[in-house]
C-alpha cells in the first residue's frame, strides 16, 4: 500500500473522503464500501479484545458525498456475551447518509472437533486481474481496489472474484480484517452484475454481512450471485472468503433502473 488513503481523519469522529472513494453511479458520490468499512472500524474501536464484531447491517439513507463526514456511535446493548452498537454517519450539512447496526460476540476457545469448511475455489494467484468497467479513470474506488476473477466475469451474474485494497482507509493505518471485508463486500453486486453499467444502475440501499471468523491476509474473496426481477428489484448474495476458506456471507438488496428512465 502507498501513502494514499480513502479518508482523512480530522478528529475522533470527523472524517473527510478522498477521491479514492468515488463510486460508479455519480462522480460526486462514494461507493458504499469505503464508508461501510470506515464505520465498522470505528465501532470496533469501542470494544475490548475479548469481543469481535460478527454482524454488520448497513443502510444507505441517501447518497454518501465525497466530502466531510461526522460519525455518531453508541452502544445499544452492553451484555457480558453480546454487545450491540449503532453508527450514524452525517454529511457536512448534518443530513443522515448511513446507518449501521453492529453485533459483537465474546470469543472463547471451543472443542477442536468443530471443523471449518475448506477452501473450494481458485486462489488469487490462479486468477486473472481485471478492471471494473465504466469507472472514471481518475482516482476512484475502481482503481483503488485490485480485482481478479477466479471464475466467471462481468455480465454472467454468478462469479468468484478476489479483491484487495491498494490504499488504506486512513493514512498510515493498516486496515483491520473487518475493514478489509466491508470495503470489498459491497462489491458483490458489482462483480456479479448481469446488466451493463452503461445502460442500467443497480444500486444497493443496504448491505448485511455476517462473519464466522476474522479474515486473514489482504485478499477477500466474493463468491457472488445476482438475481433480478423485471420490476426493478434484485438480490446479490455473496459468500465471503479469505485464502483459507469461507468466512461469512453478504447480502445486498438491489434497486434496478435504466439510466435514461425517469423515476415514477
Regions from the language model: what does each represent?
Residues 1-264:
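Terminal targeting signals and extreme-terminal segments of soluble enzymes
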Amino acid at each position: 500500500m502507498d501513502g494514499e488513503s480513502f479518508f482523512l481523519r480530522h478528529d475522533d469522529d470527523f472524517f473527510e473522503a478522498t477521491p479514492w472513494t468515488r463510486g460508479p453511479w455519480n462522480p460526486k458520490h462514494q461507493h458504499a464500501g469505503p464508508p461501510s468499512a470506515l464505520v465498522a472500524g470505528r465501532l470496533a474501536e469501542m470494544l475490548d479484545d475479548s469481543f469481535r464484531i460478527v454482524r454488520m447491517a448497513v443502510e444507505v439513507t441517501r447518497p454518501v458525498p465525497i466530502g466531510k463526514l461526522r460519525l455518531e456511535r453508541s452502544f445499544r446493548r452492553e451484555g457480558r456475551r453480546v454487545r450491540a452498537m449503532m453508527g450514524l454517519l452525517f454529511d457536512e450539512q448534518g443530513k443522515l447518509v448511513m446507518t449501521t447496526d453492529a453485533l459483537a460476540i465474546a470469543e472463547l476457545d471451543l472443542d477442536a472437533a468443530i471443523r471449518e469448511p475448506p477452501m473450494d475455489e481458485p486462489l488469487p494467484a490462479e486468477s486473472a486481474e481485471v478492471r471494473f468497467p465504466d469507472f472514471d479513470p481518475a482516482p476512484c474506488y475502481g482503481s483503488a481496489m485490485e480485482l481478479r476473477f477466479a471464475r466467471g466475469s462481468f455480465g454472467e451474474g454468478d462469479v468468484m472474484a478476489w479483491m484487495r485494497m491498494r490504499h488504506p482507509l486512513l493514512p498510515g493505518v493498516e486496515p483491520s480484517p473487518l475493514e478489509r471485508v466491508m470495503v470489498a463486500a459491497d462489491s458483490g453486486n458489482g462483480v456479479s452484475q448481469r446488466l451493463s453499467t452503461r445502460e442500467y444502475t443497480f444500486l444497493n440501499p443496504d448491505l448485511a454481512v455476517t462473519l464466522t471468523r476474522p479474515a486473514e491476509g489482504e485478499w477477500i474473496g466474493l463468491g457472488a450471485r445476482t438475481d433480478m426481477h423485471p420490476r426493478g428489484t434484485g438480490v446479490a448474495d455473496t459468500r465471503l472468503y479469505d485464502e483459507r476458506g469461507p468466512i461469512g456471507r453478504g447480502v445486498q438488496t438491489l434497486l434496478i433502473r435504466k439510466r435514461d428512465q425517469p423515476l415514477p
